[in-house]
């Protein structure tokens, strides 16, 4: 069983992609996060056994895409990085510059690099932030989305995990093809924690108690 065999990654690297005059660049950040997830920080996933189980099930599943959406400051980026730490040695690539999605040459370089890594057996994992405008419609000029679809299904499908993060307020805004069964593991909406949920989260994290009188972002 994947969940029982899992051992947190003690040390790894996140390759963050940059855009410059010479094309796609790459930096390296050490990732020492052991991948421990506070399930209480993500109450919307409790019905699936908690965030830890949900993420492990995604990593073990054949589907490629996991879509995070919702208000800023609600924990999307944090859970993305937790997933990276639990990814069993995948080559993790972070993109948070929309220019890489918008410029066809850069988008093609990114997808080409992913295919090369996959062919070398490095099992790439893409963490794609700020994708709001680029996952909504398959239109002229949106080369990134078209290539993303080819990565995640069909004859060109690669062994890749893709986590999308946007500030969209409704999953219906995401292109239906990205949500297709077999391609997508699911959508997760990130919302504010209720006062009771926030208090419980602080208690579990062994933080100083605080009284909340209204819903708050996880970042608060």
Task: Name every feature range the model reports, one short phrase each.
Residues 188-198, 202-220:
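Conserved AAA+ ATPase small/helical "lid" subdomain
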Residues 30-59:
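N-terminal pre-Walker A segment at the start of P-loop NTPase domains
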Residues 61-80:
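Walker A/P-loop nucleotide-binding motif
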């Amino acid at each position: 069983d994947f969940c029982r065999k899992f051992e947190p990654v003690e040390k790894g690297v996140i390759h963050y992609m940059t855009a410059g005059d010479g094309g796609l660049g790459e930096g390296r950040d050490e990732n020492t996060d052991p991948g421990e997830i506070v399930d209480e920080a993500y109450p919307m996933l409790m019905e699936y056994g908690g965030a830890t189980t949900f993420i492990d099930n995604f990593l073990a599943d054949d589907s490629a895409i996991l879509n995070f959406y919702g208000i800023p400051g609600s924990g999307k980026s944090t859970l993305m990085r937790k997933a990276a730490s639990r990814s069993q040695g995948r080559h993790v690539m972070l993109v948070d510059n929309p220019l890489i999605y918008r410029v066809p040459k850069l988008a093609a370089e990114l997808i080409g690099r992913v295919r090369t890594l996959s062919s070398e057996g490095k099992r790439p994992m893409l963490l794609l932030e700020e994708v709001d405008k680029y996952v909504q419609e398959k239109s002229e000029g949106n080369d990134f989305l078209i290539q993303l679809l080819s990565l995640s299904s069909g004859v060109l499908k690669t062994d890749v995990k893709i986590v999308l993060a946007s500030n969209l307020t409704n999953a219906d805004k995401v292109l239906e093809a990205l949500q297709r069964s077999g391609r997508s593991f699911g959508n997760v909406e990130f919302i504010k924690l209720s006062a009771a949920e926030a208090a419980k989260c602080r208690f579990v994290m062994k933080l100083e108690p605080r009284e909340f009188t209204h819903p708050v972002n996880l970042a608060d």
